[in-house]
Design a protein with these regions (language model features):
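Short secondary-structure boundary segments
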Residues: 44, 75, 191-193
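Classical nucleotidyltransferase
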Residues: 51-158
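Core alpha/beta nucleotide-donor-binding catalytic domains of modification enzymes
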Residues: 1-64
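Phosphate/ribose-recognition catalytic cores of enzymes acting on nucleotide-derived substrates
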Residues: 148-214
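Short N-terminal signal/transit or membrane-insertion segments
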Residues: 1-6, 22-40, 137-167
Length: 214
C-alpha cells in the first residue's frame, strides 16, 4: 500500500497567503507511519505539475509509474489542471486501466462536514477544543527550543521558548502536553504576545510560544 501526498500544499501555489497548513510535512509523515502503510510518496507540487491534465495524471502516474490497482480518495477529490477532474473523471479514466476507485464518504459532525477548512477556522479563532474534536486528536505544535529573555526563570517559573514550525498558532493559554527528548510532560502553554512584559515600543509584536513544564 502507498499513500501519495503533495508538498507544498497545492493551494500554496495559487493562494500562498491564504492557505495555512494544519501540519508540518514531518508531522504528516509521522501520522502516516502510524497506519499499516508500506510507504509514502511525496510528489513535489510545482507549476509544471499543476499543468498536468487528469488523463496524464492517471495514465502517466497512477498506471505507468505507480502500477496502481486500487485508488482510494475522498468523495470531493479534485485533480488535474485547474482542478478539472473529479471522482467521476477518475473512475472513467481508471476503468480503462482496470484500476478500481474507492470513495471515502464525508464525515459529518454537528451537521457540518469535517474538513481542513473547518479545522483551520477553529484554530485561527483559538477554539482548540472544537478543533481537537474535528481532528479526533489534540492539535500539536512542533519546533525547537530557543533561548528567551529568562524572565520566567527569574520569577521562579522557567519556561521553554519554542520556535514553531507550524503555520497556525492559535492565541491563548492552554493546558498542554509537551514531549522533550522522548519524555512527556504536563505543561501550560501560552501562544501570543507576551502577557506581562512589553518592549520599549509597546507590546511585543512577535507571536511567542512559551511552555511551562509541570
Amino acid at each position: 500500500s502507498l499513500v501519495v501526498t503533495f508538498f507544498p500544499h497545492p493551494g500554496k501555489l495559487t493562494h500562498p497567503d491564504k492557505i495555512q497548513l494544519i501540519q508540518t510535512l514531518n508531522q504528516r509523515l509521522d501520522e502516516i507511519s502510524q497506519y499499516q502503510v508500506d510507504m509514502a510518496l511525496i510528489i513535489p507540487f510545482d507549476r509544471k505539475f499543476s499543468e498536468i491534465s487528469p488523463h496524464d495524471f492517471v495514465t502517466g502516474i497512477l498506471h505507468t509509474k505507480l502500477h496502481a490497482e486500487h485508488v482510494i480518495v475522498g468523495s470531493n477529490f479534485k485533480f488535474g489542471k485547474n482542478r478539472s477532474g473529479d471522482v467521476n473523471t477518475l473512475k472513467e479514466l481508471c476503468a480503462f486501466w482496470n484500476i478500481c476507485v474507492h470513495l471515502v464518504s464525508p464525515v459529518t459532525l454537528n451537521h457540518e462536514h469535517v474538513s481542513s477548512s473547518a479545522v483551520r477556522r477553529f484554530l485561527s479563532a483559538g477554539r482548540i477544543e472544537k478543533a481537537n474534536e474535528y481532528l479526533g486528536k489534540p492539535y500539536a505544535i512542533r519546533g525547537r527550543i530557543i533561548k528567551g529573555h529568562s524572565r520566567g526563570r527569574t520569577l521562579g517559573f522557567p519556561t521553554a521558548n519554542l520556535f514553531p514550525e507550524n503555520e497556525i498558532l492559535p492565541k491563548g493559554v492552554f493546558i498542554s502536553q509537551s514531549t522533550l527528548d522522548g519524555r512527556k510532560y504536563r505543561s501550560l502553554t501560552n501562544i501570543g504576545f507576551r502577557p506581562t512584559f512589553q518592549s520599549g515600543r509597546g507590546k511585543d509584536e512577535t507571536v511567542n510560544v512559551e511552555t511551562y513544564l509541570i
